[in-house]
Amino acid sequence: MTDRAPAVESSDRLSERGSMAYLLWFFALVYLVEGLGQIGGLIAQPLTYYLKQVQGWTPVQITAYLTLFNLPWIIKPLYGLVSDFIPLFGYRRKSYLLIANAAATCGFLLVSRLTVPDQLVFALMLTAYAMAISSTLCGAVLVENGQRLKESSTFINQQWLWYNVAAMTAAIVGGQLVQRLVPTAALHTAAALVSAAPLLVIFGTLFLIDEKKAPMNIQGMKHTFEGLSIAFRRRHLWIIAAFIFLYYFSPGLSTPLYFIMTDNLKFSQAYIGFLGSLAGAGWIAGAFLHRRYLKKLTLKKLLNLSIAIGTLASLAFLFFWNETTAAIISFCAGLAAMIATVATLTLAADYCPRRAEGFAFAVLMSIINLSTALADNLGSYLFTDVFHRKLEPLVLLSAAFTAFAFVLVPLIHLGQKRQGDPAVAAMAPPPPDSR
């Protein structure tokens, strides 16, 4: 072996020692922070409760307000392009990670001092952009290494396992804050607590990531754009994008359910938080179920299984009558969501074109975020203005949308493709011989 400085050994360590362990720890750390720091994390229930109780907003207004924070997630491909080709202080990943997570901490500290929704939106938007940038960088690492090691589903499983460990914790703490504090104090306390989470990523970036300094790569940009041009002329990639959009476009139940639990079923805010933690436990159970029993399935079988389980989980909300049934249904819904997430994200990762993996994966993730945001707004609108705050017809419609995905699976022509096997070897030109 040749002698090299420790600061530039990262890629050699990953290849010589087996990169799996390093990658799994990295994904665990980033997604642990993301589970706490997203708008849907620790601050979610305190924010929703504040807007409902203090501002007197309806489900439609709350959902529309929260949808604003999906914008940074919808434009994720932009962050991928910038970080790939415009190094900041000589680094493509490290500098952006440090700045983004420092901004997230500042944003949450600012939220802890504001009360007016028009002012809160700017501070919360800062945190949303920061979390989206961190997630984009992590996604690029996942696709590049997942295709190389044929372990896309393993990495996705790991990410979402730790995301939901954080989500479980966030749901319990958020519920307790709302139960024990007045709405404004609960919101401010949640923001102050979550402001510490991005510091973990800053620590990991400084002490766990070695990255070579790199100049702006004009030639690499040219080859990647050639790969993108070829990839986006491929009909199959467009079919997959359409499938993912339709798969996730199911009228959302989350905000309507919050109003049902609060106003109709009279659940305490602590119990609502506990139900969120049970959903997180279901996600974790789904992760272990996939690792133990489902990893060997073909991707087609996994997708069909996820649709079947998702449809049944949606229909189960017809029995959302009391605390006991709510607990069982929340756990099952989380389990179904985890299997669906592994199935669809594995599909996305396996079909990303070579030399444009990070950008293409970010595009497909943006499609999921856009579809989910539209579906959530549709669900709240139907619940409020069409179904007159009746949950049952919304549940039936949501289940029907989920079941419709069965019709779409044959259009992808997956055959016997296994999870994690790259399906895009010929979708982009090979990398140039010269460096």
Predicted features along the sequence, with ranges:
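Juxtamembrane intracellular "pre-TM" segments in multi-pass secondary transporters
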Residues: 6-20, 210-240
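Helix-loop boundary and gating motifs at the non-cytosolic
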Residues: 9-73, 238-243, 247-264, 272
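Glycine-rich segments within core transmembrane alpha-helices of 12-TM secondary carriers
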Residues: 73-76, 154-174, 365-376
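Helix-to-loop junctions at the C-terminal end of transmembrane segments
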Residues: 75-91, 285-299, 383-384
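A membrane-interface helix-boundary motif in multi-pass transporters
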Residues: 92-95, 178-196, 381-403
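Helix-loop junctions at membrane interfaces in 12-TM secondary transporters
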Residues: 111-124, 318-330
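Multi-pass alpha-helical transporter architecture, strongest
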Residues: 111-112, 198-208, 394-428
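C-terminal transmembrane helical hairpin of 12-TM major facilitator-type secondary transporters
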Residues: 300-344
